[in-house]
Structure formats: C-alpha cells, structure tokens
UniProtKB/Swiss-Prot annotation:
Keyword Membrane: yes
Molecular function via GO: adenosylcobinamide-GDP ribazoletransferase activity; cobalamin 5'-phosphate synthase activity
Reactions catalysed according to its record: alpha-ribazole + adenosylcob(III)inamide-GDP = adenosylcob(III)alamin + GMP + H(+); alpha-ribazole 5'-phosphate + adenosylcob(III)inamide-GDP = adenosylcob(III)alamin 5'-phosphate + GMP + H(+)
Keyword field: Cell membrane, Cobalamin biosynthesis, Magnesium, Membrane, Transferase, Transmembrane, Transmembrane helix
InterPro entries xrefs: CobS (IPR003805)
EC number(s) per entry: 2.7.8.26
Cofactor: Mg(2+)
Pfam family, one: CobS
Protein family per UniProt: Belongs to the CobS family.
The protein's enzyme class: transferase
GO-annotated biological processes: cobalamin biosynthetic process
Protein's pathway: Cofactor biosynthesis; adenosylcobalamin biosynthesis; adenosylcobalamin from cob(II)yrinate a,c-diamide: step 7/7
Name of the protein in question: Adenosylcobinamide-GDP ribazoletransferase
Amino acid sequence: MMRSLATAFAFATVIPTPGSATTPMGRGPMTALPVVGAALGALAAAIAWAGAQVFGPSSPLSGMLTVAVLLVVTRGLHIDGVADTADGLGCYGPPQRALAVMRDGSTGPFGVAAVVLVIALQGLAFATLTTVGIAGITLAVLSGRVTAVLVCRRSVPAAHGSTLGSRVAGTQPAPVVAAWLAVLLAVSVPAGPRPWQGPIAVLVAVTAGAALAAHCVHRFGGVTGDVLGSAIELSTTVSAVTLAGLARL
C-alpha cells in the first residue's frame, strides 16, 4: 500500500518519493490517488487562506494564486489533459483521428478555450470559498481525484494505444469506488455553511466528470490519460463553483 501511495504522489505531483520509479501507475496507485487529492486540497486551502490575508477576502488574486500553485505542484498534468481532450472532442473524424489530434504536441483553439475557462472558474470559485467555507477548496480538489477512481471502474475500457489508459482503465472494483464515494460524501457534509450543500456539490461534480468520461469512451473508444486529467479538472471546477454558489444562498 505504501508503495502504491508513493507512486501516486510521484505520478500526480512534483514530490519525489523513494522507490516510486520502479512501480508503474496501475491499480494500486490509482486506488490511492484520492489520498494525494486530499493532500493537494489541504495545500490549496492553505494557499487560498494566506492569499486572502494578503489580498483581502474574496480577492480573485488569492484564487488565481491557489490555481497557480496547484498547476506547479501537479506539473500541469491534468490541465494538459483538459486541452488535449477538448481538441480531440472538437475534431471531426473517427476515433483514430481524434486520438491522433490528442497526441499532437500543439494545442488548438478548443484546448486553449477550455484551459482558460477551467483556470478562470477555479480561481474565482476558490476566491469565493475563502469567505464562505475554505474547506470547500479541499473538498473540490479531493472530488476530482475520487472521480478518477470512478472513471477507472471495472468495465471501462482503455482507448487504443493509450499507455496510461491501458494501465488504469477498468482496474477499480466496485467496493473501492463505493468506499471512496462514501468517504467523499461524508467529508462533504461539514464543508459548506449548511450540511446539505457539500454533498450536493460533490454529487454534481462527480456526475459531471463521469458523464464527460462516458462521452469520451463513446467518442474515442475508451479512456486515456488525457481523459482522466480532464475528468479530474472538470469535477474539481464543478465542485468548487457549485459549492461557492450554494454557499451564497
């Protein structure tokens, strides 16, 4: 378990972990990914809180600073998936053509627009959450990684030619998925001003990420690393935006 956790940290962050280089990303590290999400979420909440002290409550600068730190700590891994997936979904042609576009090193207009939208929405939502419930930032980041476990549940195929997809797609058994969803719902209860707001936010977020992944399976023939990254970022964004909106009620 510790080796899987170390691999998950090495894969999803810039943190070097002993022995992780010899363990490829697979079932165990994917199961442990929400633990990494919780750590990243705690870091994000701390940065947002510090930013609010410097720039003032609800300042967009504190939210954008938080997003910037997350991008650095994760090496921009997931946001790159947002760009590639958006470009793949935006192109015409069969799955092979879409996958080729995703593997291309350049970023098209769909990818640029998607990245800008995700960063802006996350930054503004994080800024709002610094005043209405900073724990919601941790919850949002965690929800993205739990969504990744859901996307890798049994019966979900990998797209043809995807190295990461072939290692993690279909690896997560139903009890593992259910356990992480239960944990997410449990910790979401105190994350908002009212106990019902957090659960609603994460349910909407996880559903959005799962729906995106399902569409990508239909469009590409399976999931890829880019699809996982885009599902993570979408769920994080939707969770933060939904909770920020509900907390204003």
